[in-house]
């Protein structure tokens, strides 16, 4: 982790790309998707829901729990627990085999989960509530969301797009547009990938 290559950015550079398009000389770090455990725990952390208690019994229904994903109960014989299906959807290795490196897949079911699952809807609601507690107006809330999720401030274009989206909502419920906006941000590649 202390090597110069490991600490490199994933930022694209035209000159370097023209010389080494496949990045064999490691002129930048290749973006990599977070594993399902880190991603789920990050979602709970940014929504201020993560239960950081150490130890205790494993959890059979991890999508209904606020415990760290480390405590998910998994089965070595198949789909015995709800956690098995959720974790496998995002490339958790099979418990029946030794796996030296996890595969990384991008399949439609993952995106359907991000758009439609009760788990993601609840995280979006919790993020919306947190942003309304911690910031006074939409501009401040957008800035806070970007700092929580991406560890940076939004660009002017991102800020304007967010304000436009939130002001264009026809919903009478104050939090609903924020839930939708938060769900989009939490489902973004920038949140799911280490850059």
Where are the model-predicted features located?
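Short, functionally critical alpha-helical segments immediately adjacent to catalytic or ligand/cofactor-binding
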Residues: 1-2
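An acidic, gly/pro-interrupted, aromatic-rich
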Residues: 5-7, 11-149, 153, 185-195
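Compositionally biased amphipathic helical and low-complexity segments enriched in hydrophobic
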Residues: 26-27, 167, 176
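Short, charged, surface-exposed loops that flank catalytic or proteolytic processing sites
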Residues: 137-138, 171-177
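Amphipathic alpha-helical segments in structured regions that serve as interaction surfaces
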Residues: 145, 161-162, 177
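Amphipathic alpha-helical segments that form the core helices of the histone-fold
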Residues: 160-169
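Globin-like tetrapyrrole-binding proteins
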Residues: 181
